[in-house]
Amino acid sequence: MHCGLLEQPDMDSTESWIERCLSESENKCYSSHTSLGNISNDETDEEKENRASKPHSTPATLQWLGENYEIAEGVCIPRSALYMHYLDFCEKNDTQPVNAASFGKIIRQQFPQLTTRRLGTRGQSKYHYYGIAVKESSQYYDVMYSKKGAAWVNETGKKEVTKQTVAYSPRSKLGTLLPEFPNVKDLNLPSSLPEEKISTFIMMYRTHCQRILDTVIRANFDEVQSFLLHFWQGMPPHMLPVLGSSTVVNIVGVCDSILYKAISGVLMPTVLQALPDSLTQVIRKFAKQLDEWLKVALHDLPENLRNIKFELSKRFSQILRRQTSLNHLCQASRTVIHSADITFQMLEDWRNVDLNSITKQSLYTIEDSREEHRKLIIQLYQEFDHLLEDQSPIESYIDWLDSMVDRCVVKVASKKQGSLKKVAQQFLLIWSCFGTRVIRDMTLHSAPSFGSFHLIHLMFDDYVLYLLESLHCQERANELMRAMKGEAHGEIREERVLGEPAISTPSPVPFSPAASSSSVEIPSATSPVSNQSPEVGVVAATTGTMQSYTWSLTYTVTTAANGPGENGQQVPCMRSPHMTPSVTHRIPVYPHREDGYTGSYNYGTYSNQGHHPIASQYTSLPHESGLSGPLYTAYHRSSSQYPFNSQTRMEPCLMSGATRLHPSQVAPRWPDVTSTNTCFTSPTMHSARYANTSDMYTSLAPRRNSDYEHMQHFPGFAYINGEASAGWAK
């Protein structure tokens, strides 16, 4: 029984060694064994201890902890994993390790603020050290246990996907505190704003935001609505006069930016970490409902306050939706990237791409393309080639995308303030063009790994957009911070979120059956300043016989109880000799009970509206001198076109027995062609219209099923006749 240890010359007392041998034999009697008869880890640890020739040194252990670990808020390391690092350190230094309990006391000597948490599902929970992270310079560095906190990777470091993925839960972030809010001492307040009122408002608003964050962490999203309503509608009367000041509006914008960033980090710390399906659905629902909750809560408050709240909430909702979709794509892409066979085929197809041709076509999107742009594209191409060749994990691809955006957008935009949006748009244009040409080249050459590249391309596109949207939000927060401190003057610029046009949100007013004059406005993609299309007035002449026109698809339906001519407005696509202004009725969202609210919208007044004839706004075209009248005959928008009381506006068109959209047949310009407003309720009617047309595209023949190995290179996507169909695989 380890009698050889008694012969060591550096023993101080044989009695201590006898006691140790007795304790070891007792531990062996109660050691556990696996089902295959393998000795447990306890015996392995004992063998390591017995092989050690040096006694344990606490100062050396403390020095090792300081060199390899650091304090980091929000990072958890399993207690067993940290102890395994310690055993490895002892083995390499030939020192005798202490047990786990004694090692825990040594850790707290180095990091006194360290806490312990029990995390995991019921029956599988484990103790974790909370607030400590592995340094990037450490040999034990793992992204999962670092400050970056990128993803859950397996402990062995292999590239195969772990069979059991640990699902993230926001409840692990309970107790998270918001960062510091602006201090009233740092603000340049005007004389009309009392400092004590602003200080009180900041304190109240921080408490309100902290309650919202705690509610989100507990996943009780429905309570957020009541918090918003109670805070804004229950505002003390003496605080109402200061809410409309630009200083308070900027303070609210800065605080909302801090809150939304904290919520985003709590719900999804990283897009690479797997989320439960239930949490994903709840996050999407929360992003959809937040705007409606704010409309209700901010009723009757100053317009500039509502505008800044709506703007930031829309950006926040867009980022949440982007994160959920990106998380799904990352989980599907992980399977592709971590497969050695697939990455080898992808590397071979990647090197067969015509890089010179694609680079030239991509540089056409730049007004003043230079040689440095071409070199940068080639450099990025080679970096991606190295990632495929090294069979890097998905975390390396994410780091590469981060560095690419930093080099191409952040550093370029930092040279000139306020140029981030323009630089980001130019980068997105080149990025989209290059990726599209690569996919096209692989399609033409029937690349075997086309499906895998398509999936990776989708994930890369979403992640780049996510990074740019985050940069956009950060720049907006910095603008509000400068405006709040008095460093910037002028009105706050309203910028649009990438990928989502800015839509002006109407202010809700109490609904009253007497006030029936209303209009339903469909927002335009053009500038909100001018409602005129480029074609109003003189039609510019172009070279040649062909002349193209761009007509705005924006229209406004104006209704009035007194008649068709009151407060009517014609928009660019509606032909009329002049434009008349209209006041848009703001549909109620949360009306007061005393105003007759019945729980639903009342569209009864729409049945009394009159017809609105659309006169000609454009004269005869120069190259069609034979036309003396308008291009189209006038038609009327009747109440049957907008059946608001039905479930959907398209329901009458989809039902075979429904009435026509127009009460009477409209005389078309070309009599031999069926009217464009006709609903085709049978294939016979559809073929009758297009039977004699020669300019229709013929149906493409389905690809052979042997062209692609469907599921080998395209996991997570369904194939229909050889074509990939992406969707949420829930």
UniProtKB/Swiss-Prot annotation:
GO terms of biological process kind: regulation of transcription by RNA polymerase II
Q: What residue spans carry the Low complexity bias annotation?
A: 512-528
Q: Null mutant: what phenotype? A: Morpholino-mediated knockdown in embryos results in the failure of neural folds closure at stage 18. Impaired ciliogenesis in the neural tube.
- Quote the subcellular location field of this record: Nucleus
The protein's GO terms of the molecular function aspect are: DNA-binding transcription factor activity, RNA polymerase II-specific; RNA polymerase II cis-regulatory region sequence-specific DNA binding
List the coiled-coil residues. none
The record's PROSITE patterns line, in alphabetical order, gives: RFX_DBD (PS51526)
Q: What is this protein called?
A: Regulatory factor X 4
